[in-house]
Amino acid sequence: MAMTVHCDVVSAEEKIYSGLVEMLIATGTEGELGIQYGHAPLLSELKPGAVRIIKQGGSEEILYVSGGYLEVQPNLVTLMADTAVRAKDVDEAAALEAQKQAEKALANKTGEFEYSRAAAELAEAAAQLRTIQKLRKHLR
């Protein structure tokens, strides 16, 4: 039986997951993070994108987070997300529309603030679409 660690995934709206995991995989600002039992203590900012939770027993769940923080302690992993959604609940049509609108806003930039906002919206829409693609690969 694989070694496990307790993991909590929370957002401002709700608790998304709480239970034992064999591994949690997320993207921090410095790159991919794979957290397993025995990992050194860590605090990292998260980038928007997919989070893979490999539960006790090997089943996997994929989430989308819009950013947040990951804290690793000896017996607890806590992911505090700005927004967290199960990948199966991400609306692909809405993400594609948001991507198109952000690309349009980037092309018609009127000021630095609008450009920065559009770039952030584009990055978030792209991250949502990548999460949907990962979920589709996982389901095959």
UniProtKB/Swiss-Prot annotation:
Principal subcellular localisation of the protein: membrane
GO cellular component: plasma membrane; proton-transporting ATP synthase complex
Chain ranges passing through the membrane: none
Protein's cellular compartments: Cell inner membrane
Superkingdom, taxonomy of origin: Bacteria
Assigned keywords, A-Z: ATP synthesis, Cell inner membrane, Cell membrane, CF(1), Hydrogen ion transport, Ion transport, Membrane, Transport
Keyword Metal-binding among UniProt keywords: no
Pfam families xrefs: ATP-synt_DE (PF00401), ATP-synt_DE_N (PF02823)
HAMAP family registered for this protein in UniProt: ATP_synth_epsil_bac
Subunit structure: F-type ATPases have 2 components, CF(1) - the catalytic core - and CF(0) - the membrane proton channel. CF(1) has five subunits: alpha(3), beta(3), gamma(1), delta(1), epsilon(1). CF(0) has three main subunits: a, b and c.
Record-given protein name: ATP synthase epsilon chain
Species this protein is from: Marinobacter nauticus (strain ATCC 700491 / DSM 11845 / VT8) (Marinobacter aquaeolei)
